Amino acid sequence: MISNLLKMLSYPFMQRALVVGILVSLCAALLGVSLVLKRYSMIGDGLSHVGFGSLAIATALGFAPLAFTIPVVVLAAFLLLRMNESSKIKGDAAIGLISSSALAIGVITVSWSSGMNTDVNNYMFGSIIAMSDEDVVLSVVLSIVVLILFVLYYNRIFAVTFDETFAKATGVRAEFYNMLLAFLTAITTVLGMRMMGALLISSLLIFPALTSMRLCHTFQSVVICSAVLSVVCFLLGMSLSFFLSSPAGATVVIVNLLAFLIFSAIARIREHTA
């Protein structure tokens, strides 16, 4: 077993995948707690569809995929936030409207273009082992920026997560921190698409947070548990993917699902025995 793990770690593409995957998993887990508590967890799914559409356009036009997609997805995140706050189109309806439109644009772009199916499929279904050195550097830098900003503004994010009205009354600029949360989520979603794919990235935001809430009862403990659980599930999923020759993103999701089911069962047993 040890020799197989060492063999896995000896491949440069696996080393890159693990470094990027751990950082993105951490970012997604930390942000996911706030998104789930604010009942906005599906924003990752909506933004990933926007990301797919913009990636298809970037590939067709010969632009750098991540450099083109990140600003587009950030703008979409701000638009979703603005629609949710001031428009008659709220929450899940706004996400569905924007995500389905962006996905349709992406599909049409792919159908009109030739020679780009492989690149687009990598972002649709995930292919972390196919990341270029430039993708790795950009992903690492942006992931570190996301983590630093989350830690720096942790108390403010906590305040707007639990009681936005009270936070405003105490002088917290709730709109700014909601925009910061949307910005960080957009960055994490784009980075996670390379690893998980547009169809599965929302699982990185949702599963660790939901699982941790079955075990912990304070915001801080849920955040810490979610971060640890997300990294552990990613490492287990990547290892199983390597040994079973299964898709990396899908395997990570299955491991997260199993963790959720196991810890939900444990929490239910604890409730009945308490």
Language-model region placement:
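Helix-loop-helix "hairpin" substructures at the membrane interface of multi-pass membrane proteins
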Residues: 136-208
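Membrane-interface capping segments at transmembrane-helix boundaries
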Residues: 155-156, 265-274
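Small-residue-rich segments of transmembrane alpha-helices in multi-pass membrane proteins
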Residues: 50-60, 98-109, 130, 174-185, ...
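Transmembrane helix-bundle core of multi-pass membrane transporters
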Residues: 2-16, 87, 95-155
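Loop-to-transmembrane alpha-helix initiation sites
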Residues: 17-20, 65-73, 92, 96, ...
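Short loop segments and helix-boundary regions at transmembrane helix junctions
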Residues: 33-116, 212-224, 241-243, 267-269
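C-terminal binding/interaction regions
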Residues: 4-10, 124, 128, 229-266
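Transmembrane alpha-helical segments in multi-pass inner-membrane proteins
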Residues: 195, 199-250
